[in-house]
Amino acid sequence: MNNTTSDINDQRYEPREVEAYWQKEWANDDLYRTNTEVNKENTFYALSMFPYPSGSLHMGHVRNYVITDVLARYKRMKGLNVLHPMGWDSFGLPAENAAIERETSPSTWTDKNISQMKDQLDRLGLSIDWSKEVTTCKEDYYKWTQYIFNQLHKNNLAYQKKATVNWDPIDQTVLANEQVDAEGKSWRSGAKVEKKELNQWFLRITSFAEDLNKDLVTLNDWPDRVRVMQKNWIGKSIGAEITFDIKNSDQKITAFTTRIDTVYGVSYLVLASNHPLIDQLISSNDIDKLNDFRQTQEKLSDLERNSDTRQKLGMYLGVDAINPANNKEIPIWIGDYVIMEYGTGAVMGVPAHDSRDYQFAKSYDLPIQYVIKPNIGEDESYLNAEFVDKGVMINSDKFNGIESDIAKTKILEFGSNSNWAKPKITYKLRDWLISRQRYWGCPIPIINCKKCGQVRVPDDDLPVVLPIDIKLTGKGKSPLTTKTEWINTCCPKCGTDAKRETDTMDTFMCSSWYFLRYINPDNCEKPFLKSEIDKWLPVKQYVGGIEHAILHLLYSRFLTKALKRCGLINIDEPFKKLLTQGMVQAVTFKNPNTNKYFSKDQIKDIDNPKDPLTGENIEIIYEKMSKSKYNGVDPSVVIDKYGADTARMFILFKAPPEKDLEWDDSDVEGQYRFIQRLWKFVINTFKLTNNNSRSNIEKEKSKDEEALRLINIAIKEITDDLDNLQFNTAISELMKVVNGLSLIVNYCSNETLNKVISILVKITSPFSPHIAEELWKTIGNTQSIHLQSWPEFDAGAIEQDTFKLMIQINGKVRGSINASKNLSKENLEDLAIKTEAAIKWMDGKEPKRIIVVPNKLVNIVI
């Protein structure tokens, strides 16, 4: 490396010049290239969730990437071989829509954005190994996404079927259930989602439902919140499947329940509107009514239909079933809250013991039969509403008087012996729908042949490359359906004319395995090497937003398990530790009556804010940074003004990483002042060690010991904080040690000062790499600070020769005094009696006895 940029006499740190210089030096020296000659025990894979290349970083990005970078730098100094890569989640609708709007191609738009964002990332001083870079929209990446699809297809884990799907009318594409929010709107466009029946490709994630659920308990270093969200989404239910005969028919209806103890209270059945039996059972007189009902409910999303607050709609099918437990006839209804894809598409109506069923029964005047009562004697107040708790069986034939929990087992045994019930485990989890009717995605490598059916594109013929010269409109069918010369091809099996699949894959398919490709991104023969995956995976620390708890994180877990089943890898889980960082928030100015946002510049009086249009009161609150809310802060502006190290320090110090961070300009200024203070302290201390006249100044051994004590406390505290991801308290400790050392440096020996400032610069370097590098060279070192070892904690240095001796009179603390640890019991007694506190409270009395607790207290009993 070249020499420092600074003059030893400089009293002010100029971040812009220094940071640009060292970023260039690090790149020229390839400082952060990963050592590939490693063993598993000595590796640390630090990974941030890779970004969509929008063209500009936001503060949420900064927080994510800085957290990961601090860990990467720290682990390198701890002697581990660190992999810290970066890439681009670059397929998807935003690029396609941006290309349409700007009349360019998605690839051109994406390449430009990637170039801009790489520059922005480098300005943050991130220790990224750019030789590991991956871009999901490049052929050398999506070739292997297609290869993985082929492996899944070979193993019966990918299939096509006709399905009613969530259709985004704005983006003109299909959405997975996970991509529809609680209001039935698209997660990306915000459009009201519609229902549509199409041939779609699915991945068989349900084959791994039990493993995905069971293995959550092994993810001890994941946030509980994320594990609970995944557990609820997988939705394992242990219960029974009950078979109901249909009156005057050979047909039967099966329904799943977790409450077989309520079977005697089933007073009706409810079918999903697309249940296959409906069209066989419906009277011709009711077909028009049925069609009207179906059209109404098809406008609802699954989440809306399951909502507890929405009134449930239904219609009587005109046919009855038989309750097998008591042989009573019960009506069969169609209900908009029953979803065919969940369970069997039929549910038991038990209004006495289920809130949703109770609401439905009240709406349509259906019978309500209580079969469980509270275990509280004769109190019948429970009859006024649904009773959903445990209790005692009633109206249940031979099971009356039994506790409901015990009755579950007995009724299931009875039903099994009578052939109308059997044990059953179900999951809410549905297979992953990956078909997308858009251009900018990974083509599905399937060829449709009239003779051979669906045929995989041979692995040797991959990738199926997206056509470049294509007109994008954003409307109607997939743009690929217009490229007949691309669609028309030959069947790989029989050689006859055939057509390519025109759907592309969900972008989450590309982002569910990228962490594997980082290991060998230049490998042209395989997507990854199993032996290398064994060395680096699972990722030791993954950092990203909580919004990916279900989509990306669940899909990545599934694909990892699927690839293991296909024999491609050995690991079961992709990420050992997960940190979900909080949002970065800033002040917003909003009219609560109109929900209109205003910029700070539009508010004339911040102390008494008013809507500039209506004069109404403005609400000032912290919200997630957003352009639409006028509260975004451009990282580039902050770096230009204060430097990257200040931005890094602020983002780390302001809040614990898992908590939301409230942006405050004054706090940024505070970090900038600390950077300047750190600079001056190290420079001035270094000057002291080179001051010849200092040899005449009397040094104090106690000050040397104090300096070493302070720096070793800092080593221990900061090491512990980094191990526990508590970056804010680590930086607080940095500030504390600088303040403490500043008071005593003039009385310390040169040897101690040189040792202390070297350690200080080292423990600063993960947080503020630029100033640390500059200071390291300024104090006379040649090799980069980022190639140094993390300082070892010296426990002996923090042990002091003195301690605070507490003086008690009759068991009550009355004072204290510093005492030597080497004093005998008699010396401590003598010292305690002569203190001002003892003299005052003894008031001339002689002690009856004196109790000494070594290195702690003396209790004088009078």
UniProtKB/Swiss-Prot annotation:
Q: Name one GO cellular component term.
A: cytosol
Per the database entry, which stretches of residues form a coiled coil? none
Provide the protein's localization. Answer: Cytoplasm
**For binding ATP, which residues are annotated in this chain's numbering?**
K627
Q: Per the similarity annotation, which family is this?
A: Belongs to the class-I aminoacyl-tRNA synthetase family.
Residues spanned by motif 'KMSKS' region: 624-628
- Where the record places motif 'HIGH' region is 51-61
Q: Determine if Aminoacyl-tRNA synthetase is one of this entry's keywords.
A: yes
Query: Which key words tag this protein in UniProt?
Result: Aminoacyl-tRNA synthetase, ATP-binding, Cytoplasm, Ligase, Nucleotide-binding, Protein biosynthesis
Top EC class of this enzyme: ligase
Q: Which GO terms describe its molecular function?
A: aminoacyl-tRNA deacylase activity; ATP binding; leucine-tRNA ligase activity
Gene Ontology BP terms: leucyl-tRNA aminoacylation
Transmembrane found in the keyword field: no
EC number(s) given by UniProt: 6.1.1.4
Q: Mind telling me which Pfam families this protein's record contains?
A: Anticodon_1, tRNA-synt_1, tRNA-synt_1_2, tRNA-synt_1g
Question: NCBIfam families recorded for this chain?
Answer: leuS_bact
Q: What is this protein called?
A: Leucine--tRNA ligase
Taxonomy, superkingdom:
Bacteria
Chief subcellular location equals: cytoplasm
